[in-house]
Regions:
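Hydrophobic alpha-helical context, especially transmembrane and signal-peptide helices
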Residues: 5, 17, 43-45
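Bacterial N-terminal signal peptides
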Residues: 10-21
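Mature soluble binding/inhibitory domains
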Residues: 23-157
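A short linear-motif detector with a strong N-terminal bias
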Residues: 4, 20-23
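Bacterial N-terminal signal peptides that target proteins for export
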Residues: 1-12
Length: 157
């Protein structure tokens, strides 16, 4: 009897230990949508623009609000090579079930003139409260493409 009870206990423990990693993995799988990424965000941008004259450092800090339909608007203060500007922006985002996303953002100067259009690739982590982003493209209003190495670190507020 004692031997049978110990054998059963050992089998139950072995099954539990074998199944535990699968249960943890199942809990880690996230299914994201625009609802996951909706909310108020704060962010910093860092990197370089690659101009014909060479690489120029870029940094920015800003915030935006994104709705459940993937629309967003916000503002930032950015420095490109030491030249500071206040900018506003509007855009759209499509958030995928695997928690990746693509943003298309139109950026405007203080007078409301279009300055550039940026396409960004993002991944949401920490239950949709953290975003890591890389710029896919930066295009000026005349169609000129600016090569860049820019990233954004964002936090849902």
């Amino acid at each position: 009897m004692k031997h049978t009870l110990l054998s059963r206990f050992a089998i139950v423990m072995a099954v539990a230990l074998y199944a535990a990693p699968a249960l943890v993995l199942a809990q880690d799988i996230q299914h994201c949508s625009n609802a996951t990424s909706a909310g108020r965000w704060g962010f910093t941008t860092n990197g370089v623009l690659i101009l014909p004259t060479g690489a120029v450092p870029v940094t920015a800090v800003g915030h935006f609000v994104q709705d459940l339909h993937g629309n967003m608007e916000g503002s930032q203060v950015r420095s490109v090579g030491g030249g500071v500007a206040h900018e506003t922006f509007t855009g759209t985002v499509t958030t995928n079930p695997d928690c990746t996303a693509k943003y298309t953002i139109s950026v405007y100067d203080d007078s409301g003139n279009l300055v550039r259009i940026s396409v960004l690739d993002a991944v949401f982590t920490n239950g949709g409260r953290k975003a890591r982003v890389v710029f896919e493209s930066v295009t000026l209003p005349d169609g000129t493409s600016l090569p860049s190495v820019l990233s954004i670190d964002g936090d849902k507020q």
